[in-house]
Design a protein with these regions (language model features):
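Intrinsically disordered cytosolic tails
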Residues: 1-148, 182-195, 199-200, 204-388
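Short, flexible helix-coil linker/hinge segments at the edges of structured domains or between repeats
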Residues: 149-164
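Short aromatic-rich membrane-water interface segments that cap or initiate transmembrane helices
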Residues: 160-180
């Protein structure tokens, strides 16, 4: 399929299994149905099992399933988010792949080098070994540590009956958590493929023009594409928000106690998502530096000619003309505008809006903590105190 040639998500062991079952040829809303299926497989058995043993609904001093906000955030929010966001993210990444091939960024004689690079990415996407390793990593903690549960000290947990896993706890540890890990690892593998592509891209023979109106030598579209991976930071933010809410609810901690953790997560997640674009910085810096050298020399010649014509003295034909009526001033102003645009060229294909959106993806899941950690009246009074 032609569209799959430029797709980063479609391919690999899991995609081939879905294709073999005929699932990919059905509904146009496949990702929604798949997300519902994964949520049902991971969560419904636990709802039934906890309802049977009496740990479904909240009890005083004991954390029930419906009171375990970390589990609900993982299975009800983060898991379907990663599945549903994949097609939309893939569409934008696919456009970025096409842009690399069709935007005249590579001279015709070097196109085979770029096509070979894209083919290597497709082979990495379609290979069964990476996704088989993802499956292995997803289940490996079960065999290494015996239990992968993260328990709150001094809190009775719905997953344990004494020191033994309950049936719902076994389903959570053996099915739900590995399933979530697998989906997250598939996303991370695509992210590593994309990062590898950005690392190799400067070696593919790109010819950039510092005068490009996008302010990034023609590579600004990569910053837009990078935003698509911010869904990873949103999913991580949901997990962190659920864990912090558990600590606030069951351990008596406050939002102030976890402020450094929350701030560190937003800053760290944003930095990790922006970091791959820094691999293009040497190429963009070199392009900008060489262009500044050329335009400096050209500007010197243009300024000298301008001075010679209009400021060299009165005994010339220039005295008979008006500077306002002549095209020299307009041409020099146009040149100055081009030079200023060149001097402000970004050395990373990322503008402030790209950075803002990436940071917001990490921040938004944490915002409900503010509403849950304090009353609305208290929040309004503090806002009024700040503003007034």
């Amino acid at each position: 399929m032609d569209q799959d040639s430029y797709s980063l998500m479609r391919g690999g062991l899991v995609h081939r299994l879905l294709h073999a079952t005929g699932a990919l040829g059905g509904s146009a809303h496949l990702s929604l149905w798949l997300a519902l299926l994964l949520v049902a497989v991971s969560l419904l058995p636990m709802l039934l099992l906890t309802a049977v043993d009496g740990t479904l609904l909240p009890k005083h001093g004991a954390m029930s399933l419906l009171g375990d906000y970390a589990t609900l955030a993982r299975l009800l929010l983060a898991l379907p988010l990663l599945v549903i966001a994949a097609p939309r993210s893939d569409a934008l990444l696919r456009n970025a792949f096409r842009q690399l091939s069709h935007a005249s960024l590579v001279p015709a004689r070097r196109l085979p080098r770029l096509h070979a690079l894209l083919q290597q990415v497709r082979r990495g996407r379609d290979g069964w070994v990476p996704e088989a390793l993802c499956v292995l990593i997803a289940v490996l903690p079960l065999f290494l540590s015996g239990t992968a549960l993260s328990l709150l000290p001094g809190v009775i947990d719905w997953r344990l009956d004494g020191a033994v896993l309950t049936p719902a706890g076994r389903w959570y540890e053996w099915v739900a958590v590995p399933l979530f890990r697998l989906v997250a690892l598939l996303w991370l593998w695509r992210y590593l493929l994309w990062t590898w592509l950005l690392w190799r891209l400067p070696r593919s023979g790109l010819v950039l023009h510092a005068e490009h109106p996008d302010g990034a030598g023609g590579l600004a579209f990569l910053g837009i594409a990078q935003e698509r991976f911010a869904v990873l930071s949103m999913a991580g933010g949901l997990l962190l928000a659920g864990a912090c809410l558990n600590h606030i609810t069951w351990l008596g901690q406050t939002l102030y106690d976890v402020r450094h953790l929350l701030a560190g997560y937003v800053i760290g997640a944003t930095a990790l998502l922006v970091a791959p674009l820094l691999l293009l910085m040497p190429l963009l810096m070199r392009t900008k530096r060489h262009a500044l050298y050329r335009f400096d020399a050209l500007g010197n010649r243009a300024a000298a000619l301008f001075d010679q014509r209009w400021q060299a003295g009165a005994a010339s034909a220039a005295d008979e003309d008006s500077l306002l009526d002549h095209g020299d001033a307009s041409a020099f102003a146009d040149f100055s505008g081009v030079y200023k645009g060149l001097a402000s060229m970004a050395v990373v294909p990322l503008d402030r809006w790209n950075l803002l959106w990436i940071a917001l993806y990490a921040l938004l899941p944490l915002c409900p903590l503010v509403l849950l950690a304090m009353s609305v009246d208290e929040l309004v009074s503090k806002l009024v105190g700040i503003l007034v």
